[in-house]
């Protein structure tokens, strides 16, 4: 809150909490005293804001103005109204440009698994070799 608003609030509270006489002791009052114009003008000057032509603002209005608003519905309306589809190549290019040059930002390249190497020889070749080598 601004200092002017605090001062105004304190003035209002001070006026309501002014020392009052106990109810049993009433002072005899005479005719009401007229305040001179000068004091009225000074009091009116105090109530006015310091800037020319400004109207005192409500604290609730100030709060509502600064209060966080949820823009989800407005954003969703906007997004659903604009249904322009972008080409896949364009979107991939945008994603590529937004990626950094560090290794952690780059996609992992998939490595191809090597197939298990099979034997060149067949079972018959092994049996033939066994008979020639061992002679059985």
UniProtKB/Swiss-Prot annotation:
GO cellular component: cytosol; nucleolus; nucleoplasm; small-subunit processome
GO biological process, one term: ribosomal small subunit biogenesis
Stretch list, region Disordered: 13-58
UniProt modified residues of type Citrulline: 7
Organ and tissue specificity: Widely expressed (at protein level).
InterPro entries associated with the record: AROS
Superkingdom of origin organism: Eukaryota
Chief location of this protein within or outside the cell: nucleus
Modified residues (Phosphoserine): 84
Key words of the record: Citrullination, Nucleus, Phosphoprotein
Localization in the cell: Nucleus, Nucleolus
One Pfam family per UniProt: AROS
PANTHER family, per the entry: ACTIVE REGULATOR OF SIRT1 (PTHR31454:SF2)
Family to which this protein belongs: Belongs to the AROS family.
Subunit details: Part of the small subunit (SSU) processome, composed of more than 70 proteins and the RNA chaperone small nucleolar RNA (snoRNA) U3. Interacts with RPS19; the interaction is direct and mediates the integration of RPS19 in state post-A1. Interacts with SIRT1.
Protein name: Active regulator of SIRT1
Organism of origin: Homo sapiens (Human)
Gene of this entry: RPS19BP1
């Amino acid at each position: 809150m601004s200092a002017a608003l605090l001062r105004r609030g304190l003035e209002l509270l001070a006026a309501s909490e002014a020392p009052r006489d106990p109810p049993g002791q009433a002072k005899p009052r005479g005719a009401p005293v007229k305040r001179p114009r000068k004091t009225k003008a000074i009091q009116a000057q105090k109530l006015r804001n310091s800037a020319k032509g400004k109207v005192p603002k409500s604290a609730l209005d100030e709060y509502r103005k600064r209060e966080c608003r949820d823009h989800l519905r407005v954003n969703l309306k906007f997004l659903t109204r604009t249904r322009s589809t972008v080409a896949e190549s364009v979107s991939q290019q945008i994603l590529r440009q937004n990626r950094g040059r560090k290794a952690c930002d780059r996609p992992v390249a998939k490595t191809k698994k090597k197939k298990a190497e099979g034997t060149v020889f067949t079972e018959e070749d092994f049996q033939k070799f066994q008979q020639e080598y061992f002679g059985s």
